[in-house]
Structure formats: structure tokens, C-alpha cells
Amino acid sequence: KNGFPGRILTTRLTADLMKIMLLDSAHIQESDAEYENRKGERAGREHVDPLYTEQDALDVFKYVTTCEYKEKVDLCEGVSAVFTDAGHLLGSASITLELEENGVHKTIVFSGDIGNVDQPIIRDPQLLKKADYVVMESTYGDRNHTEVWSYTDELAEIIDETLGKGGNVVIPSFAVGRTQELLYFIREIKDQKLVKSTPNFPVYIDSPLAKAATTVFCGDLHGYLDEQALELVKDGTHMFTFPNLNLVESSEESKMLNMDTTPKVIISASGMCDAGRIRHHLKHNLWKPECTIVFVGYQGEGTLGRSLLEGVRSVKLFGEEIAVHAKIVNFQGLSSHADRDHLLAWIADIKAPKPQHVFIVHGDREVAPYFAESVEKLGFTAHAPQYTEVYDLIDDKIVAPGYLPERKAKAVGGQRVS
């Protein structure tokens, strides 16, 4: 839209998911702009354009080039890229840039989000052996995940207990990756008849984006699945379908769910509860002590999801103060991010050659420098660069310092969260 003329290089399945997500986001941008313009016209404000439109999103794909894992892609003279499975989401990748100039050869690895081990469906992160420099994430750099003996058994216990009391299980979930994992586990729960109180309990997927993304997960996944998932596919098992699974289409159907008193499982986006249909379901279920809200993913600072996990007693939704009486469960083991120990194991495996410098990014402002210290204890040189910092790789020094952006206080449930 602003004149970018180059290529957008990504894995095949990331491109498939990106198209769905960009179109969904563009639709929201257009709807929000239309709403603001209706209000603004009455108030005499200037016309607002959407950040991008659905046509803009479609135009992106004129520039997209797809590749597969381990395929070397020449970007220009002396620069090539190799994508390695990061085990985070379907199609996710760490990227190794190979640079050569005047006979000098260097490699820079960008970790991207590194995945958790033993996730269903996708493979574990593929380890890398060499790099001169590494730019590495630190989402969970200060903690380890709670060990879970069986995701299926634990989730079944939560569902059984809640539905047995006549309540609903409401699961805020990311539409891509996490929702499909939940469907995988619930299929196992139903196959094994683990929910005794309501064996044929209804499950509602209330996210058009999740529905569209699931079609990608049901497509050609050659080269992306783990061994267990491959066996299921060979046996003809549909990994994400089971009896009494209901896909909610319209917003009217979504609202009707809250009029239905049948105990049920509702999976809806967004995963951090800051937007989407999940907010309606929270409004109708948070105040009920018989209901359970299950968080199955990372909750960022300042989000409604983080506030609920931290024990806020009430929240404001759609102009109403809603008391929090439902049981709040943090299903920590179910994470698509590597925890502290697995992040350290990932970087420790890069040793031929050992990186000259490791840059720690993509973590809360307290977490990134803490994790950098952990990496240094392994014998690496590491630091967490600040925003806009410029680092000279040849001279191995900071040439322009960065800064920490000011934290903005955010109102959540009538309270200021900073």
C-alpha cells in the first residue's frame, strides 16, 4: 500500500494462514472505520480511512513467495535464507541468513517464536548447530511451564466438574494453533469417554477465523506434522472433528449461545480477551460461580486476560460492571512457547561455531534482560537491546543507544493497570 516493491518470503502453510488472517483483520479495520465515520459525521470530525482494506490484503499476495523447510532461497548476491521448523505454530520458522562479502562468511539466526516440546499435531523445534549471531525471543525466559501428566486427562477433569455443576466452560483461545489443539484434545476426551457427567457434551467454536484456520489444518500438511499426527492421518482419523461439535457462524448465533442454559464448552477468540466474541461470553459467564474460565495461552501485560489471572474482582464489559465469581483456571502446560529451560537448551545447542553475540528480544521488559543473564551463564555474550538500539556487528559494540518506551496505563475492569 505504501510502495513496498520486494518479495514476501514465507513457508507454504504460513502463507495459507496469513491470507485468512489478513482478510479477517482487514474486515475489522473497515468495520471499525465505518463505525468511527458514522459517529464522526455527527460530531463534525474528519473522515477516517481504514489502516488497510480487504483489497489491500489481497494485493499482498502478489508479492508472496513460498518455500519449504530447509530449502535455501537466494535473496540477492551474497545473501541467502533458510527456514527451519520452529515448532511454534503450523508453518512457523526460525530463519538463518547466510551472508558473504569479500570472502567473509557470516550467519545470523533469527529464532522467531520457539515452540514448546511435545505439542500435538506439529513437530518439536528443530535445533540449529551454528551461527555467528543470534536474535532470540524470551517470552517465557523467566519461568518454566507447569508439568502436566496428561493434557487430555486434566482438561477432561475441568470439563466434567464444571458441566456436572450445570456450568459452562469458557475458553478464550487464539484462533490459529491453540483452537486446533483444543479440538484435538477434546476428540481424545470424547473417544475415551472421560467426561462422565455429560458424555456427549456440546462444544461450540465461536470464531469465524478459527473455523477458517481449521480448514488449513485439514489440508496438505506433508512436511509439517509430528509422527503421532501422521499416524492418525494414515489411519483415516479426523483430528479435529467429533460428535456434537458446533461451528458458530453469525454474531446472532453467538448471542443466542448465552440464552441456551445447556452446560457446554465455548471456545472463542481473542485469546487475551481484549476483542472479539469472547467478551460477550465472559459478560454472561464470569459472574456465575458454577462456570469455569480456562486460559490456555500467554496473557500479555495490560490485557483483560492477565487481569483475570491476577485475581481482579470485577471487570467492565460493554459498559457494565461484571463481578468475577467463576472459577479461573490457568492451563499453563498448554503453551506453544518454549519455557526457560527449553529456550536455554535451544541456544546451548548452537556451538559449531558458538555465536559471537546473542541478542535477546520479544519478552516483557523485565524478562528479556533477566533471560540475557541466564544465557550469559552458559558462556555466551548476550544482552537485551532497547528499542531503536543500533549495534555494529563488525566492531561488536552499540553505536546508537535505544530507549524503553513509556508504559501506558490501561483501564481494565474499572482499575488502572500499568
Please provide the spans of the model-predicted regions.
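A general structural motif
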Residues: 114, 146-152, 243-253, 271-274, ...
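Short, compositionally biased "basic patch" segments
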Residues: 120-135, 222-228, 299-325
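Conserved phosphate-binding/catalytic loops in two-lobed NTP-binding clefts
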Residues: 380-391
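Short, conserved loop/helix-junction motifs that constitute active-site signature segments
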Residues: 2-3, 126-130, 198, 284-289, ...
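Amphipathic alpha-helical heptad-repeat segments
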Residues: 21-22, 27, 360, 373-377, ...
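Generic long, charged, amphipathic alpha-helical segments
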Residues: 316-349
